[in-house]
């Protein structure tokens, strides 16, 4: 018989840097899950990823206090900022432009993110990412 699911917990955790401090500790503790077990398993699975890169993770909590988790790809905005070596987006995206990104760079990001996006193909994913870039105050070239 399948285990009874009692809830889902969505967090953004830096790769390889999961520890019991907030936000992880309180979120898992409320459901009675073993915090250190999650931290060790998460850090082990994210060894090959750039340390500190924020990764969305969905934790499924079961009635017997066990859990499973799925690690998703980094947020699009993080990948865009990394691609154009930007610290943060524009505070006023319409008037203040903070950088430029090319279609080729967006295609690279789209290939990485495609499995987590609801886009039919790479071209649709590129257009979605271009919208995210524009809302950050980044000029999109070649689209």
UniProtKB/Swiss-Prot annotation:
Modifications made to the protein after synthesis: One or more lysine residues are methylated.
InterPro entries, alphabetized: Ribosomal_uL11, Ribosomal_uL11_bac-typ, Ribosomal_uL11_C, Ribosomal_uL11_C_sf, Ribosomal_uL11_CS, Ribosomal_uL11_N, Ribosomal_uL11_N_sf
Highest rank taxon of the organism: Bacteria
GO cellular component: cytosolic large ribosomal subunit
Keywords: Methylation, Ribonucleoprotein, Ribosomal protein, RNA-binding, rRNA-binding
One Pfam family it belongs to: Ribosomal_L11
Assembly information from the UniProt record: Part of the ribosomal stalk of the 50S ribosomal subunit. Interacts with L10 and the large rRNA to form the base of the stalk. L10 forms an elongated spine to which L12 dimers bind in a sequential fashion forming a multimeric L10(L12)X complex.
Role summary: Forms part of the ribosomal stalk which helps the ribosome interact with GTP-bound translation factors.
Name of the molecule in the record: Large ribosomal subunit protein uL11
Organism: Paracidovorax citrulli (strain AAC00-1)
UniProt gene name: rplK
């Amino acid at each position: 018989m399948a285990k009874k699911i009692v809830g889902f917990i969505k967090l953004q955790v830096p790769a390889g840097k999961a520890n019991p401090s907030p936000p992880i500790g309180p979120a898992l503790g409320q459901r009675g899950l073993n915090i250190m077990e999650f931290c060790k398993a998460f850090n082990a699975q994210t060894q090959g990823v750039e340390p500190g890169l924020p990764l969305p993770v969905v934790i499924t909590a079961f009635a017997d206090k066990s859990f499973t988790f799925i690690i998703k790809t980094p947020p699009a905005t993080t990948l865009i900022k990394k691609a154009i070596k930007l610290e943060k987006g524009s505070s006023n995206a319409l008037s203040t432009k903070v950088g430029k990104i090319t279609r080729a760079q967006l295609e690279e990001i789209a290939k990485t993110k495609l499995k987590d996006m609801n886009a039919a193909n790479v071209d649709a994913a590129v257009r979605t990412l271009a919208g995210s870039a524009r809302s950050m105050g980044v000029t999109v070239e070649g689209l």
